[in-house]
């Protein structure tokens, strides 16, 4: 059925599971939630190569943060393998490549460093809006590099390349 569950059951457990999985995968690919204009046409938000470098990360934070970045670098106060084993069946993206030690070499265009123990709902809204914040900042041009602080985040920009055109697949 259209709803993903039994006919007429838009909010069946199967539909909720599928919807949750699809939203997380959309965010992994595009770096943001689905956005639309007043005519319901899609708004494509710039996709940056963003790495989160998170001190004091735990498994709950990893689950919340992982879809919102290209790579997440965590301290090993817990075993990320449990999260990877549980989440990997829900995505084609290799999570063992996305989740790295905080001591690993960073190779993202943009690094966002923060203490996970200080994350609040307001801070998480900054994460959700980060691509739009970066693209709307008049000071960020194609060749802008540098760093700034925003809320609990230290943001380092090494490259402002965007990747949304590379994410569109059109095979004939």
Where are these regions (language model features)?
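Short, well-ordered secondary-structure micro-motifs within conserved domains or adaptor modules
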Residues: 93-133, 153
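ANL superfamily adenylate-forming
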Residues: 134-144
């Amino acid at each position: 059925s259209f709803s993903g569950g039994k006919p007429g059951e838009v909010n069946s457990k199967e539909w909720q599971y599928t919807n949750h999985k699809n939203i997380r995968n959309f965010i992994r690919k595009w770096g943001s939630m689905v956005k639309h204009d007043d005519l319901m046409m899609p708004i494509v938000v710039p996709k940056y190569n963003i790495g989160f470098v998170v001190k004091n990360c735990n498994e709950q934070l990893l689950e919340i943060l992982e879809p919102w970045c290209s790579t997440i670098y965590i301290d090993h106060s817990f075993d990320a393998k449990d999260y990877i084993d549980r989440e990997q069946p829900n995505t084609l993206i290799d999570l063992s490549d996305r989740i790295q030690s905080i001591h690993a070499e960073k190779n993202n265009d943009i690094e966002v460093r923060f203490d996970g123990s200080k994350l609040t709902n307001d801070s998480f809204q900054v994460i959700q809006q980060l691509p739009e914040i970066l693209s709307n900042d008049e000071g960020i041009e194609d060749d802008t590099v540098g760093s700034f602080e925003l809320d609990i985040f230290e943001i380092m920009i090494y490259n402002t390349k965007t990747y949304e055109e590379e994410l569109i697949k059109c095979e004939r």
